[in-house]
Amino acid sequence: MAQVDLLNVKGEKVGTLEISDFVFNIDPNYDVMWRYVDMQLSNRRAGTASTKTRGEVSGGGRKPWPQKHTGRARHGSIRSPIWRHGGVAHGPKPRDWSKKLNKKMKRLALRSALSVKYRENKLLVLEDLKLERPKTKSLKEILQNLDLADKKALIVLPWKEEGYVNVKLSGKNLPNVKVIIADNPNNSKNGEKAVRIDGLNVFDMLKYDYLILTRDMVAKIEEVLGNEARKALTA
């Protein structure tokens, strides 16, 4: 099992946490990570860009001038793409840019990104990270304690609780910090709250230099992404 230092909000080491090799210490699959990021960026595209062809531009029903004897170049319509205010040749039309990735590839990409952070010593695990009220100064002090004052940091929290929500609100004014609450409170399975890691994504993990997780978030990630390892052992 891989190990990582367990820190408090003062930046002090309070213990060691064992983490799953299957989730946090695999050989990263960069191809699958690229596919995941490509999917994310493609799915952000609105696909609403639109231009009119010569058949859609208004006007130009008649020939602008006779074919011969004017001394001017021949033209059949003012809607031609070579005319000002004419139609557009091969212009964009509304389309769906969205892409899909199967569940196994998504999970492999997430495990690869987590492993990159662990192997580069850019994964920090805290006992917990909650604030009594939204205050940017409080979160900034915590980041200074972790020597991340001027670094780009992604903070991922497990539940949509008040203390975690306050951290998310506190991080909105910090340009180098993004806070994700990886939870979907509306999701349930058989009447029970399903364990989800919604929001955790490869693009943000690669964009930000450091990844900060809580102990509960690590357990949650291992529960979701470690399913394949458990299935292999019981097969």
From Swiss-Prot:
Assigned keywords, A-Z: Ribonucleoprotein, Ribosomal protein, RNA-binding, rRNA-binding
UniProt source species: Thermotoga neapolitana (strain ATCC 49049 / DSM 4359 / NBRC 107923 / NS-E)
InterPro entries: Ribosomal_uL4 (IPR002136), Ribosomal_uL4-like (IPR013005), Ribosomal_uL4_dom_sf (IPR023574)
Record-given protein name: Large ribosomal subunit protein uL4
GO cellular component, one term: ribosome
Family per record: Belongs to the universal ribosomal protein uL4 family.
GO molecular function, one term: rRNA binding
Organism superkingdom: Bacteria
Subunit and partners: Part of the 50S ribosomal subunit.
Role description: One of the primary rRNA binding proteins, this protein initially binds near the 5'-end of the 23S rRNA. It is important during the early stages of 50S assembly. It makes multiple contacts with different domains of the 23S rRNA in the assembled 50S subunit and ribosome. Forms part of the polypeptide exit tunnel.
GO BP terms in the entry: translation
Region of interest (Disordered), ranges: 45-75
Basic residues biased stretches: 65-75
